[in-house]
Amino acid sequence: MVSRRTFLSGVAGSAVMPTLSFAQSPAGAPSASGKVALYANVGADLTHYDVDVATAELTKRQTVTLPGGVQYAWPHASHRYLYVISSNNAPGYVREPKTDHHLTALAIDPATGAIKMHGTPVRLPTRPLHVSLDIPSEHILVAFNNPAAVRVYRVNTDFTPGEEVQQGTIDPGIFAHQIRVTPDNRHAILVTRGNEGTPTKPEDPGALKVFDYRDGLLTNEVSIAPDGGKGFGPRHLDFHPTKPWMYVSIETQNKMYTYMMENGRPKPEIAFRAETLAEPTNIRARQAAGTVHVHPNGRFLYGANRAEETVDYQGKQVFKGGENSIVVYAINQSTGEPTPIQHIETQKLHPRTFHIDPSGRMLVAEHNLPVNVRDGDAVKEVPAGLSTFRIGDDGKLTFVRKYDIDVAGSTMFWMGMVPL
């Protein structure tokens, strides 16, 4: 009899296995067809777009409605399924009952990229914030922020989400924001951001929670938390595709940290610190470092800078100022150190997620909400939407076009690309 592991590994192996060059989802190596599908949400609606990498153009195709507001998604290694987490109690999307939170499988048409519901959604206990799969796509890992937690679900032989893998005692930290399995599939890292302090509440410490990982089980937890996690608010990480280097965006300090990997695990020492902002001494409003991606060729690193704080102007709330940009770093191929070489505005506000196509020639940034900005003495609205960029041989970005999207009181929260 064929075992579950053998069956799933065989199906995954029948397609091009993904490289590990993305923090949000593994776009993988370019497919034989060269086709790429992009998926982006507005609230509970997840829309499929065709992607023309050569022209950096997107064409809207079809929309599937999930049980709640989309929070995150991650593709199966075969590129034929997409696993989506959703919630009815999330920023920009609050619906009754607020206790509805789900993990849903979608089937991807390998010829067109069209998506459809696959099986019955699995109910989750609280709002999920991040989802990923292990390297052979045998398990789905879900991170929850409040209360912080991580759960692991088996992938059934029909590719629907299966039973939960029961864990031992885990310290999930404070405000878990991402869960990733390391490239060797032997460890898992839970990124816990903590919370910034306020005049009435002290800072909650952040940490990287590193586990041994085997067949869905998380064990032997070790916490990486410089200075006890104070002044350390990690948000997202990504791995270099071929070297033992890990990059972590530090949201609350607007930094990019580099960690060396040893025996598949990150060493606790910070190898390199880099700024994310073009003007780190000119903070006009709250800045937050965001998503981080290593280019598929391993030579460049990309990170998001986000700002959306508003102030009253003529009776309207308008953008207070700040950097909404992608920072590009050149990676020293001997040491792993990233050096900033470009900061480019994304043409909209709050680029929560961005993604690089599998060929490494195109980057797309997603922006959550419409925001008013001053235009001289007037006020105009900058809509939510998508911006596309061409990636040069030198790693630098060139803005190509933007797509305004009416979120109708909801929010865009996630987007990603999958090769077909």
Show which residues each predicted segment covers.
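Asp-box/WD-like beta-propeller blade repeats and closely related beta-sheet repeat scaffolds
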Residues: K116-R180
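Short loop/turn segments immediately following beta-strands, especially the blade-tip
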Residues: D50-T55, A107-G113, R154-T160, D212-L217, ...
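Short, solvent-exposed loop/turn segments at conserved positions within beta-propeller repeat blades
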Residues: N41-V42, Y93-D100, N145-A148, T198-G206, ...
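Short loop/turn segments immediately following the C-termini of beta-strands
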Residues: G43, S87-N89, N145, R193-G194, ...
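A short beta-strand motif characteristic of beta-propeller blades
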Residues: T59-V64, M117-P121, V165-T169, E221-D227, ...
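Beta-rich, blade/repeat-based domains predominating
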Residues: P67-S78, L124-P136, I170-N185, G228-W245, ...
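N-terminal secretory signal peptides and thylakoid transit peptides that target proteins
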Residues: M1-P18
